[in-house]
């Protein structure tokens, strides 16, 4: 009985450790410049574990350099090994070469830019550049965005290899995050057909009130297929990224996506 239970226990421990890493990864680097990182209590609340269990797991992550702890504030952040693994991953699929393109688009538009792939029914952010603006909207690398309530998610659905109707059906119940969220499968399906036709998606407060965005597909290199692996997006506060401004940025976003296409990225 003991030997049979061990693998299950090991899997649970790994899942819990990954949950902690995700929480730390989703914490903006400038969330609290004077006290960066998260306290143990905050992490435990986010992963729905007791502080003692969280501490036991996080000590292992610290020992393996996936997490670091500030000796003064005792707050936790991602460690150097997490950075090494992230860079290895980006390099393995060619994403390091995307960074200059994202930076140019960020500088041109004044807003944060990001690249996402379809992963586990989410739009998984694999690269990003932060705006220099004090008030901005960031999608941190590693973050998973709702497909139906994000611009990049809607692009990935609209150009899905399985077709829009099937892709929407597989989403199941659509969570309504704000009054602007499209939570009806019928409405979402119709909207995604429009997105596929116009080749861009807008988001006006569909995930967070006051946060808008525009995204376009990154077409596959050397293929006639319109089924895509990547979506490129620009995000910002609604005070700057108005509907008119988003439409003005579509051409710049499309041009940047074409440059990324020419890189011939591997499948993430």
Residue spans of the language-model regions?
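N-terminal helix-turn-helix
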Residues: 2-92, 258, 262-263
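Amphipathic alpha-helical effector-binding/dimerization core
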Residues: 72-73, 77-172
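A structural signal for short hydrophobic beta-strand segments in well-ordered beta-sheet cores
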Residues: 67-69, 115-116, 218
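Short, structured helix-loop boundary elements
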Residues: 10-14, 75, 79, 95, ...
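Charge-rich, low-complexity intrinsically disordered segments
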Residues: 5-8, 244-268
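Short amphipathic alpha-helical signal-transduction/dimerization elements
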Residues: 25, 153, 157, 161, ...
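Extended hydrophobic
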Residues: 180-257
